[in-house]
Amino acid sequence: MRSFITALPFLALLVDARKCGNEVVPPSVQMAARYFDRQDKLADARTLQAVAERSLVIDTYFHVISSDNTLKGGNLPDEQVTAQFNALNRDFKDTGISFVLKDVTRTVNKEWATFSVDNDSKDVEYTMKKALRQGSYAALNVYYRPLGDGLLGICVFPEDVTQGDRTFVLDGCQVLTGSVPGGDTTNYNDGKTATHEIGHWLGLFHTFQGGCAGGDGVDDTPAQRSPTNGCPTTNPDTCTGPQYPGVDPIHNFMDYSYDICMYEFSLGQTKRVFDFWDRYRAPHIGGPEPTVTRSSTTTTTTTTTTTTTPVITTTPVITTTSTTTKSTTTKATTTKTTTTKSPTPTPSPSIPDWWCDLFGICRSA
């Protein structure tokens, strides 16, 4: 539903239900969403048809962070990594978005695997992501680890960044290891958590955000009073009255239903994704990639880097290319490897008309 509120902390309050934890939506993102909302009102059928026919391929990096080399400790076998990757492409297929798995890293680091997602742990999160993150701001980095606090995942929204700054480093999604296909999280183990979180990474809000008086800022998702728990046999209608047409979108990936219940994004959500992509992430395509530093500070650290053959429509081939193990019984060990890619210069983009309308910063006459 089209509507906005001023603060959007994506933290579920339900017990024994899907829990997604997110940062408050930055004011600049809310402002951009309002602008996109105004533009949507002017969109005609041809504009929406153009959105439906558009396509996008996103470079993707998976990082598996575990306490030890066991499945219980958070280490995922290649088969489940492949299944999760294929689930993402299946879930986003109707939006025209596909993912290319560029690299899979595996890191054994108990502190990184178990830290809580809160403001007090930002330094640990920053250290982990600075060591593992790859690609430009247009590249998706997903960190699979045994999240605590009952959370299934957490992801950040797109916003203005400078290559390599703190906001750039903290970009990406953290997803509960047990939520991958075949994982041990009952009702949430078909890979849909990653789909939901990546929806946030692409600019989408929860369908129930703000209740009946709030909304996700997308016109074709009906108003919803509260998140869905489970998978109802019929769609409830929690926001009644002529001003709230439609029933709750319980099958939408941005609700909180069981994985088995989720299977769609709306056309309006697809348009919003491309709006945010063009505004925030597309300008970074082809730009210089940051220096990638691999480091760890636990008493026993194993880092395995694997590469994948980019495959979109078929099962990706995962091939291990290097394994590095450092251990000691007397003191912490720090391992660092630095890889620098030659920057590719890109011309500075011109200031678009919508930027002038939105922020009042315009071209010189």
State where each predicted segment sits:
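Fungal extracellular serine/threonine-rich, low-complexity, intrinsically disordered "mucin-like" regions
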Residues: 289-365
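Propeptide-to-catalytic entry region of secreted or membrane-anchored zinc metalloproteases
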Residues: 16-138, 145-148, 290-308, 313-314, ...
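Fungal secretory targeting signals
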Residues: 1-19, 364-365
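Second-shell loop/turn segments in exported
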Residues: 69-77, 183-188, 260-261
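Metalloprotease/metallohydrolase-associated module, dominated by Zn2+-dependent proteases
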Residues: 163, 221-297, 360
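Metzincin-family zinc-dependent endopeptidase catalytic domain
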Residues: 82-230
